């Protein structure tokens, strides 16, 4: 197999479709209401996530790719909340705000990881004049390498034929995750990505691989597509194109926690790769790998370039996890959702020695994941003196990344990791040496969050300073 990469240097993607705000209320359920036979949920946390076409844009932004999002929202609080959420991820929002309709919002109430109720706030946009949206599309589409039309059947894409023609006139490929059984409305699109049930609802039941291929190629011909990608759940996905062999990819998911938004991930990565100049085969391969990652997460989620790169090269998360703070926060949230215990430590780790190895192995045994926060070069210099560090940050983190005991690495620039620890809030904070727990940076934040703090012993005689002194003696 070719050496594929999750780095998309040239890609720019435009997304247009049904944007939504997903709200989650989490709480404990310990009793039944005296008013009616329903559980009482004591809400303890709440969360907001981008849904629909907005989740597609979030998926693209998580790949460090330039993305613009177009759609219809209301002139309301939820529209403002959605816009703010997206802008924080550097997504260029180009919405048409309506006085007549609310922003589509879905509120889910959960307890102990079980969804108890979903409340939908919406009115379809089928009676809305979309001329302003079409004008925005015509003005912007020529600046992008791919257009995704994200259809959730809410009416934003009622003029989908006009949208396809605008993009094709600008020589921009159009990818659509279809909705409903009227695929004729998508005539002339570059590629559709129906799941198996959506595909069979249009072409009829397929009992064999041959039937899928035959009916898929006929659909391509009937509605003038360039290609068709059928996503087939546990059977992977199949790419069909006229006069070419079918390209089948088996599923790569190891464990399925939630399929919410998996289709969004597929079309996001697929469009991003095509916009970056990749082939259909490589683009589908990357999309399939990304889908395998995202179904292992809880709720509507995205895939980072680190996760995708690791999966492409069959790297386990353990031992290869150099991350930005934002990527780490996402990884920790997903791990906690799976019930994993997060352990965190920090240090300079200038010259790695047996004491470090033993310490990190012991720390890792205390939980399911170990985070190592590493002082930046300037931070080490302030703490240790002008002659340090011996090894720069990049090299120090690369060496630590090779240890099986280390799950994730993150740099910090301050003298202490107190702020970072307060953001990550591990279940257990550990530090080596003769500290008292209350003296450890970040201990107050961890305790306040219900976590614990533990001091581990270092091996006697093992220190970076001792190593440096021995080297000096050899030199003399």
From Swiss-Prot:
Active site positions, chain numbering: 264
Superkingdom of origin: Bacteria
MF terms in GO: ATP binding; heptose 7-phosphate kinase activity; heptose-1-phosphate adenylyltransferase activity; phosphotransferase activity, alcohol group as acceptor
GO biological processes: ADP-L-glycero-beta-D-manno-heptose biosynthetic process
Binding site for ATP: 195-198
E.C. number(s) listed in UniProt: 2.7.1.167, 2.7.7.70
Keyword terms, alphabetized: ATP-binding, Carbohydrate metabolism, Kinase, Multifunctional enzyme, Nucleotide-binding, Nucleotidyltransferase, Transferase
GO cellular component terms attached to this protein's record: cytosol
Region named Cytidylyltransferase: 344-476
Catalytic activity as recorded in UniProt: D-glycero-beta-D-manno-heptose 7-phosphate + ATP = D-glycero-beta-D-manno-heptose 1,7-bisphosphate + ADP + H(+); D-glycero-beta-D-manno-heptose 1-phosphate + ATP + H(+) = ADP-D-glycero-beta-D-manno-heptose + diphosphate
Record has ATP-binding as a keyword: yes
Gene3D superfamilies assigned: 3.40.1190.20, HUPs (3.40.50.620)
Start and end residues of each stretch annotated as Ribokinase: 1-318
Pathway listed: Nucleotide-sugar biosynthesis; ADP-L-glycero-beta-D-manno-heptose biosynthesis; ADP-L-glycero-beta-D-manno-heptose from D-glycero-beta-D-manno-heptose 7-phosphate: step 1/4; Nucleotide-sugar biosynthesis; ADP-L-glycero-beta-D-manno-heptose biosynthesis; ADP-L-glycero-beta-D-manno-heptose from D-glycero-beta-D-manno-heptose 7-phosphate: step 3/4
Biological function: Catalyzes the ADP transfer from ATP to D-glycero-beta-D-manno-heptose 1-phosphate, yielding ADP-D-glycero-beta-D-manno-heptose.
PANTHER family, per the entry: BIFUNCTIONAL PROTEIN HLDE
Subunit (UniProt): Homodimer.
Family: In the N-terminal section; belongs to the carbohydrate kinase PfkB family.
Identification of the protein by name: Bifunctional protein HldE
Lineage summary: Bacteria, Pseudomonadati, Pseudomonadota, Gammaproteobacteria, Pasteurellales
Gene designation: hldE
